[in-house]
Curated annotation (Swiss-Prot):
GTP binds at residues 20-27, 88-92, 142-145. Pfam families: EF-G_D2, GTP_EFTU, RF3_C. GO terms for molecular function: GTP binding; GTPase activity; guanosine tetraphosphate binding; translation release factor activity, codon nonspecific; translation release factor activity, codon specific. This is Peptide chain release factor 3. GO terms for biological process: regulation of translational termination. The gene is prfC. Residues 11-280 form the tr-type G domain. It comes from Enterobacter sp. (strain 638). SUPFAM superfamilies: EF-G C-terminal domain-like, P-loop containing nucleoside triphosphate hydrolases, Translation proteins. Gene3D superfamilies: P-loop containing nucleotide triphosphate hydrolases, Peptide chain release factor 3, domain III. One of its GO terms (cellular component) is cytosol. It is found in: Cytoplasm. The keyword Nucleotide-binding applies. Keywords: Cytoplasm, GTP-binding, Nucleotide-binding, Protein biosynthesis. Increases the formation of ribosomal termination complexes and stimulates activities of RF-1 and RF-2. It binds guanine nucleotides and has strong preference for UGA stop codons. It may interact directly with the ribosome. The stimulation of RF-1 and RF-2 is significantly reduced by GTP and GDP, but not by GMP.
Length: 529
């Protein structure tokens, strides 16, 4: 049976994001992936912050200064017969809720682990978010050209800490200065590593078969014997790859390599193309929407301001769930019930914006937005429904915002509410006083907010520490008990940017005690947009 042209386009799409701890090599791997997709000709490794050859996926002024990728950009490139959409996730200490939310817009994730360090804190947090939707995960063990921990030990740590089974697809031969390449367990081939070829795609020398005498010549007798011994152990002790379990988010295929040396990245990409799901169905408040449906639907997962310093615009990033976007089509913005004609949607090659004529499920398009679009907005061809599963996450860091000029309180509030609708920060207004508290997931968000308040709203503000450890959205089905809870805890209650009641806890101990005291009240860590 031949698929219709529309379904052929859907079947080509793969949409994924990379999750890692800062400095595990995420930006480098992004560069190399784009190199294989021929989207850039030579990879501009992210050098020291002063260097002029900035990596392609880092943009916005503050990023250029700090050498980090703050804003979640989107890159589309062809690979084999597929079209891959890679959503970049800010990786530094200065990442934000955008990073979390981006993970709700992809069908698959690539987890990059520094094989010398193993599982790190940020990776744990991001994996928790992928668990909300049981997203399939591929794993790349990076930095094999350095001295690493025992690969078996690192895989055990992944299984233990991230609660996901590991199925090695390739296995390293040596590491550091002795790194010779990898063996592919399912193709029975050895791929040999050459140093100094990191900026280009290299022809890799292949030795066919583990028992091939050429192996000794290529890697030396000692490493060849060691490899065969290790593989007996690996085959006995590790899981076999199972596609069904991978799609359910229960097992991850593991690839070894070095992103900086541009080795092993293509094995991982081949696995992604072969195993990652096509665009997946998504839930709305009324029904499940399948990618095969021909009527257009999509949702906004992120809004970014000033992608173009020359134009002070905001761009809303929309993930297409079903149907085909065509230039000039009329779409309904469901939340406000208004029809809009969209003739200037954008596609992205990090920072290079180009107008898009058409887009299919799995693609990300940018909509120009002058403050009318919010995170979580659903666009359809008329059907009244709302996509679910695009959450707000309870902030982990809090500051009080203070004005230099007290007469600008109104502009400050307007600016903060708009920034919170964009997902740049969350704002809380305590019920018992006139403070304005902002909450974020990464420290840099506070600097971004102060800079944007000044440039976009002409408000000079400073932030200072505040005695808040965490926040939870509260609700209760028993009106009487809820009233009593509100009366007795007024000093800890606040309204967020969308006027939702929030409990602001000065310490985790306070939160735990309050939760025990009021078992009928629900304290939530995430809230639907």
């Amino acid at each position: 049976m031949t698929l219709s042209p529309y379904l052929q386009e859907v079947a080509k799409r793969r949409t994924f994001a990379i999750i890692s701890h800062p400095d595990a090599g995420k930006t480098t791997i992004t560069e190399k992936v784009l190199l294989f997709g021929q989207a850039i000709q030579t990879a501009g490794t992210v050098k020291g912050r002063g260097s002029s050859q900035h990596a392609k996926s880092d943009w916005m002024e503050m990023e250029k200064q700090r050498g980090i990728s703050i804003t979640t950009s989107v890159m589309q490139f062809p690979y084999h017969d597929c079209l891959v959409n890679l959503l970049d996730t800010p990786g530094h200490e200065d990442f934000s809720e955008d990073t979390y939310r981006t993970l709700t817009a992809v069908d698959c994730c690539l987890m990059v682990i520094d094989a010398a360090k193993g599982v790190e804190d940020r990776t744990r947090k991001l994996m928790e978010v992928t668990r909300l939707r049981d997203t399939p995960i591929l794993t790349f063990m990076n930095k094999l050209d350095r001295d690493i921990r025992d690969p078996m030990e690192v895989m055990d740590e992944v299984e233990r800490e991230l609660k996901i089974a590991c199925a090695p697809i390739t296995w390293p031969i040596g590491c550091g200065k002795l790194f010779k390449g990898v063996y592919h367990l399912y193709k029975d081939e050895v791929y040999l590593y050459q140093t100094g070829k990191g900026h280009t795609i290299q022809e890799v020398r292949i030795v066919k078969g583990l028992d091939n005498p050429e192996l000794e010549t290529a890697v030396g007798e000692e490493l060849a014997v060691q490899l065969r011994d290790e593989l007996e152990l690996v085959k006995g002790a590790s899981h076999e790859f199972d596609h069904e379990l991978f799609l359910a988010g229960e097992i991850t295929p593991v690839f070894f390599g070095t992103a900086l040396g541009n080795f092993g990245v293509d094995h991982m990409l081949d696995g992604l193309i072969e195993w990652a799901p096509q665009p997946m169905p998504r839930k709305t408040d009324t029904r499940l929407v399948e990618a095969s449906e021909e009527k257009f639907t999509g949702f906004v997962f992120k809004i970014q301001a000033n992608m173009d310093p020359k134009h002070r615009d905001r761009v809303a990033f929309l993930r297409v769930v079903s149907g085909q976007y065509e230039k000039g089509m009329k779409l309904r913005q469901v939340r406000i019930g208004k029809d809009v004609v969209i003739s200037d949607a954008l596609t992205f090659m990090a920072g290079d914006r180009s107008h898009v004529e058409e887009a299919y499920p799995g693609d990300i398009i940018g909509l120009h937005n002058h403050g009318t679009i919010q995170i979580g907005d659903t666009f359809t061809q008329g059907e009244m429904m709302k996509f679910t599963g695009i959450p707000n996450f309870a902030p982990e860091l809090f500051r009080r915002i203070r004005l230099r000029d007290p007469l600008k309180q109104k502009q400050l509030l307007k600016g903060l509410v708009q920034l919170s609708e964009e997902g740049a920060v969350q704002v809380f207004r305590p019920i018992s006083n006139n403070d304005l508290i902002v909450g974020a997931v990464g420290v840099l968000q506070f600097d971004v907010v102060v800079a944007r308040l000044k440039s976009e709203y002409n408000v000079e503000a400073i932030y200072e520490s505040v005695n808040v450890a965490t926040a939870r959205w509260v609700e209760c089905s028993d009106v009487k008990k809820f009233e009593e809870f509100k009366r007795k805890n007024e000093i800890q209650l606040a309204l967020d940017g969308g006027d939702n009641l929030t409990y602001i806890a000065p310490t985790m101990v306070n939160l735990n005690l309050t939760q025990e005291r009021y078992p009928d009240v629900q304290f939530r860590k995430t809230r639907e947009h």
